């Protein structure tokens, strides 16, 4: 299954993927049980020109897994980034999260 780069044209699919997460999964992804409005604000504020997002789509072209590598805006922390990953419940156990993490590490090193 290929990993694709995501851009602002994928914003609606990112929103749908994240809002489909169950409360416990939202807590794991965001560090708190984000509600739909909080997720919408998060997606609206993604800085695609600075950050890097990767996704995996199923055969129906639904986003089933995604990773967000968010780089610090603080000039003193230019080498710092935050990583977030989520995988749709039905797609877990297939190594998608690990593959997205590996891709993010390679990108961050370069």
For the regions a language model picked out, list residue spans one by one.
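Long, contiguous binding/interaction regions
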Residues: 1-110
């Amino acid at each position: 299954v290929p990993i694709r780069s995501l851009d602002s044209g994928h914003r609606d699919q990112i929103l749908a993927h994240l809002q489909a997460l169950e409360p416990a999964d939202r807590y794991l992804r965001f560090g708190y049980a984000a509600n739909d409005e909080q997720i919408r604000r998060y997606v609206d504020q993604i800085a695609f020109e600075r950050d890097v997002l990767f996704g995996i789509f199923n055969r129906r072209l639904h986003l089933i897994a995604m990773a967000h590598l968010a780089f610090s805006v603080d000039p003193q922390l230019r080498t710092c980034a935050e990583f977030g990953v989520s995988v749709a419940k039905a797609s877990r156990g297939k190594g998608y999260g690990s593959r997205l993490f590996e891709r993010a590490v390679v990108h961050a090193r370069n």
